[in-house]
Regions:
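Individual alpha-helical transmembrane segments in multi-pass integral membrane proteins
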Residues: 1, 13-115, 201, 228-236
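Alpha-helical transmembrane segments
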Residues: 1-5, 61, 133-141, 208
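Cytoplasmic membrane-interface regions of multi-pass membrane proteins
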Residues: 42-49, 110-126, 188-195
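Hydrophobic alpha-helical transmembrane segments and adjacent interfacial helices
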Residues: 63-71, 139-143, 208-218
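Interfacial "cap-and-anchor" motif at the non-cytosolic start of specific transmembrane alpha-helices
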Residues: 146-237
């Protein structure tokens, strides 16, 4: 559906992403993360000794919050409340914070998993880990909101550069940070868990796919916008 919609809805130079495609992919990701959140919560309720599952569920919950906010932002450009360039930058800000929150929360879950496997005392207590996790779940969107177009004095500019085709593109430095974070998580997870645990095999896939679709963002300024479709399709799959 994404590929068909992308073929028949080619954007002009003023748009980077057809809004119908964006909404369709966001709904798919929202559904997937909802299922993952519920599954991890049920898994934690079944075995409360596995606190890492609770932290993993919060990682997917944070994604749900960012998805809802992103859909609201897209509606603003549909209703012509904000310009396309402003909306694209706001979406980039929330995407950056979503990626950072997801990666950091999964890393916290990994730290707890390692301590559970080795029977060693965790660096942080469960209460401290829960507080840190809740900060990223609810505090991250607040910080992203402050850095968006709602507060011009603190506005963060990620998607502000324009290529030769007149399209707004992302600053490579922010994308590089996300790639480095996911590569680090992927390496650490493979080192401690390998391919022994079903859930953590899924984390390996998530981290690997995150590296792929974030690398594809580096080519948005050089190639057509179809690169964006490929990156989002990878994330959905």
């Amino acid at each position: 559906m994404v590929l068909v919609n992308s073929w028949f809805n080619q954007p002009g130079v003023e748009e980077v992403v057809p809004r119908s495609t964006y909404l369709m992919v966001m709904i798919a990701l929202f559904f997937i993360d909802t299922v993952a959140f519920i599954f991890m919560q049920l898994y934690f309720i079944y075995d409360r000794r596995q606190f890492s599952n609770c932290v993993l569920s919060l990682a997917f919950l944070s994604c749900l919050i960012y998805f809802v906010i992103t859909v609201i932002i897209i509606q603003q450009i549909i209703e012509e409340r904000l310009t396309s360039s402003v909306v694209q930058n706001d979406i980039a800000i929330y995407y950056l914070f979503r990626q950072m929150s997801l990666c950091i929360l999964i890393f916290l879950a990994l730290v707890n998993k390692v301590s559970e496997n080795t029977k060693q005392r965790n660096l942080f207590s469960k209460k401290m880990t829960l507080c840190i996790s809740l900060f990223f779940v609810f505090g991250g969107p607040i910080v992203a909101h402050i850095l968006s177009s709602h507060y011009e004095s603190y506005n963060l500019h990620i998607a502000e550069l324009t290529n030769e085709n007149g399209q707004v593109v992302w600053k490579a430095s922010y994308v590089t940070i996300m790639i480095f974070m996911w590569l680090t998580l992927l390496s650490v997870n493979l080192y401690f868990n390998g391919l022994r645990y079903d859930i953590w095999n899924g984390v390996t896939v998530i981290a690997f796919c995150a590296v792929l679709y974030n690398i594809s963002l580096l080519f948005m300024s050089r190639y057509s916008v179809s690169t964006w479709y490929i990156s989002r399709t990878i994330e959905v799959v």
